[in-house]
């Protein structure tokens, strides 16, 4: 099944079917996509591609950037490897504080807000649980840097969508690149589609 989560199948779970998990199968391609989204957003590539005339310089480098990754599973491990040539300072937020190769700092989820402060780019790469629904809302977005991008390759429910729209419309953060949304699929009339600092790709 080409999507994450079993919520849609809960009504038909029974002992007549064998359910298996493809955990880790998509870690590397998802991490690659996350990196592509970060570069596209931070370097203002999407904006340049839509421009009919050139203006002043825009965008920032990923080289040497402060990176925060929320989640400590296979996608994070693959993403950390992909970030190695960029010499980023990497902080990982996860449930259990255990060292990860290539990561400068690992903190618990209770330190999420501190890990958002000063980050140039924030990646969401964690599973959706009752504790992580609405993990990123207005209080978290307000502490982020005005140039920071948030990249969500996890689940749409991690971000409070209305709060994200507010943050993007008011330039509270630099932008958002979303491989997942809440709701999903996103209605054609949703404001996220038309925001110049929002990139959306099909999960």
Language-model regions, residue ranges each:
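Phosphate-coordination loops involved in phosphoryl transfer and adenosine-cofactor binding
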Residues: 16, 63-67, 138, 147
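Glycine-rich NAD(P)-binding loop of Rossmann-like domains
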Residues: 47-78, 105
